[in-house]
């Protein structure tokens, strides 16, 4: 299937599925123009840019009993946030911010208001099952991302379309154009895999990962992704792991280092960033040496590697929950009868990373709709606190301002500040004391539009 045909088919599927699901699930508001991107890094599709929906007209004033300052990692009391259109126009103490007489006031004086959460590693598409149409696959993806939005994740980085070609690009664009509700997305398209055994899926499905065999076609694969509109280049320097009889873990390495270096160099030449799926071993080492911008998973990351990542300015995205239970326990039980377990190794690595000064540790769930259901990603914050020893405030920073910075969106999201998008969430308690408050979301606003308000009667919230 040609790239053009693939894009046309994906766009048709997204359009049909989006129209159907939006009609069924949401009553939308009429819309208008968008705003240009002013940040660094991959070009996002913030919108709407001529789409159908927009936030309510006039000024919105949010009274916050407690407001989380994600820059400083602390709570501020009795704050007011003024919003016009999609943007925040003023933030400050209630005694200092004058609320216009005609403003619509949202009273969250008994709640904690935070920036919208950012999930740095999602898969909106499930792997397609035999006989599943692209339209059905797209419907499921839209349902997934809307569950994420209602759970408070107003932005996300989608790390490959799970054998659905570049349909994630079309969904990202549909969201930015206001045609469907969903988080602000950066996407990675098909992903690039090493030819040979790891490319068998592509032989069965031409929309699966794009296989490469040498440095030249590696560079061409990066260019194809950029031409199709991918924001990130998803690479797979490492594959599965297995325990030897001695208890030592062995990891599959895929691309030779020169090919991996060509992939990353071409990505950077085109002003994009690379995300590398590695579980450990030589592939993990190569990803760091080659300068992969974000290292995903890395079960046995060690201090020497973490220190090198700090020097190179790389970020670590463990996807803690997704790769522990049930994945690791199931894998290790089948392979060793539970004699050897990866979970303690992974927990040690994440705790070490969290304690490494200067290392940017991201909050990315790895949610895939199969082993980890969409809408449940707030569990990732809890595990960082309870298993990796992060303070709740630092975990909140990882899932907001740090993720925004790594994604190049630091001027637009990740903090409640003047000029940024009005992406806000609210919970009843104090998540800096009890991080599980994020699992009981009450209010979600994206770009000044109220997505969820569980404080209201169901009939009122639906209007």
List each model region and its residues:
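Active-site mouth loops of central-metabolism enzymes
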Residues: 127-139, 201-220, 273-275
């Amino acid at each position: 299937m040609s790239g053009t045909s693939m894009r046309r088919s994906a766009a048709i599927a997204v359009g049909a599925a989006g129209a159907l699901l939006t009609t069924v699930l949401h009553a939308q508001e009429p819309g208008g123009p968008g705003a240009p991107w002013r940040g660094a890094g991959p070009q996002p599709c913030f919108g709407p840019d001529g789409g159908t929906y927009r936030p309510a007209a006039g000024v919105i004033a949010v009274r916050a009993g407690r407001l989380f300052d994600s820059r400083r990692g602390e709570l501020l009391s009795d704050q007011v946030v003024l919003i016009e259109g999609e943007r925040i126009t003023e933030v400050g103490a209630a005694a200092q911010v004058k609320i216009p007489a005609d403003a619509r006031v949202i009273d969250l004086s008994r709640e904690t208001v935070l920036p919208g959460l950012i999930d740095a590693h999602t898969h909106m598409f499930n792997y397609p099952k035999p006989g599943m149409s692209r339209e059905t696959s797209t419907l499921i993806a839209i349902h997934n991302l809307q569950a994420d939005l209602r759970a408070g994740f107003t932005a996300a980085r989608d790390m490959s379309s799970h054998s659905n070609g570049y349909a994630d690009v079309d969904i990202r664009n549909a969201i930015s154009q206001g045609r469907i509700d969903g988080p602000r997305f950066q996407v990675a398209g098909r992903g690039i895999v090493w030819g040979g055994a790891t490319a068998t899926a592509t032989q069965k499905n031409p929309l699966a990962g794009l296989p490469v065999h040498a440095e030249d076609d590696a560079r061409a694969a990066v260019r194809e992704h950029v031409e199709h509109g991918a924001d990130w280049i998803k690479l797979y320097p490492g594959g599965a792991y297995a325990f030897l009889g001695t208890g030592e873990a062995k990891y599959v390495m895929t691309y030779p280092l020169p090919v991996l270096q060509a992939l990353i160099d071409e990505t950077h030449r085109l002003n994009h960033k690379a995300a590398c799926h590695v579980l450990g071993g030589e592939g993990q080492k190569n990803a760091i040496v080659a300068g992969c911008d974000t290292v995903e998973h890395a079960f046995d990351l060690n201090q020497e590697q973490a220190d090198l990542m700090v020097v190179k300015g790389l970020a670590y995205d463990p996807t803690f929950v997704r790769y522990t239970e049930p994945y690791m326990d199931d894998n290790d039980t089948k392979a060793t009868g539970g004699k050897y377990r990866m979970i303690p190794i992974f927990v040690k690595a994440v705790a070490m990373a969290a304690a490494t000064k200067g290392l940017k540790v991201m909050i990315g769930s790895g949610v895939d709709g199969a082993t980890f259901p969409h809408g449940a990603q707030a569990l990732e914050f809890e595990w960082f606190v309870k298993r990796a020893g992060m303070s709740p405030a630092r975990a909140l920073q990882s899932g907001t301002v740090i993720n925004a910075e790594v994604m190049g969106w630091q001027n637009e999201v990740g903090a409640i500040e003047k000029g940024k998008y009005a992406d806000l969430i609210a919970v009843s308690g104090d998540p800096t004391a009890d991080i599980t408050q994020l699992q009981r979301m009450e209010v979600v606003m994206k770009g000044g539009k109220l997505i969820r308000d569980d404080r209201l009667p169901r009939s009122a919230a639906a209007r």
